[in-house]
């Protein structure tokens, strides 16, 4: 599977950090990588301008019939960093990665997040989600 170079680098960094947590995690493949049975939704490119935001939400649904129910990993790749505000905020922490860096986190209900209001400039991000192989979309 070929995806944006920045996302590939982010997934590699994610895998390397998992190994540092515990060496046994080396046996777990990176989602969407070689020898996995996961799939990725189409990449969406989003743009937020001054005064726009995205309210708190989770990326996976709790309704089994919903497409979002099967999402396991969320990825937000920052395509710009020349804006003010517009952080990705979780309950206890917020981030504003530099352009080309990605946030990778579980899609489930334990990770509610929002896009805070952009106060100037344009925030551009590419988002996608990995899900397990046993669904029919």
Where are these regions (language model features)?
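Fe(II)/2-oxoglutarate oxygenase catalytic core
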Residues: 1-102, 110-137
């Amino acid at each position: 599977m070929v995806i944006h170079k920045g996302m590939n680098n982010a997934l590699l960094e994610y895998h390397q950090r998992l190994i540092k947590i515990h060496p046994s995690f080396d046996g777990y493949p990176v989602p969407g990588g070689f020898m996995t049975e996961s799939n990725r939704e189409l990449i969406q490119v989003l743009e937020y301008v001054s005064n726009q935001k995205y309210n708190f939400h989770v990326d996976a649904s709790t309704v089994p019939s919903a497409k979002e129910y099967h999402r396991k990993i969320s990825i937000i790749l920052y395509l710009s960093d020349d804006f003010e505000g517009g952080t990705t905020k979780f309950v206890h922490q917020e981030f504003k990665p530099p352009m080309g860096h990605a946030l990778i986190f579980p899609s489930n209900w334990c990770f509610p997040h929002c896009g805070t209001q952009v106060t100037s400039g344009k925030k551009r991000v590419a988002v996608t989600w990995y899900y397990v192989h046993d669904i029919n979309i």
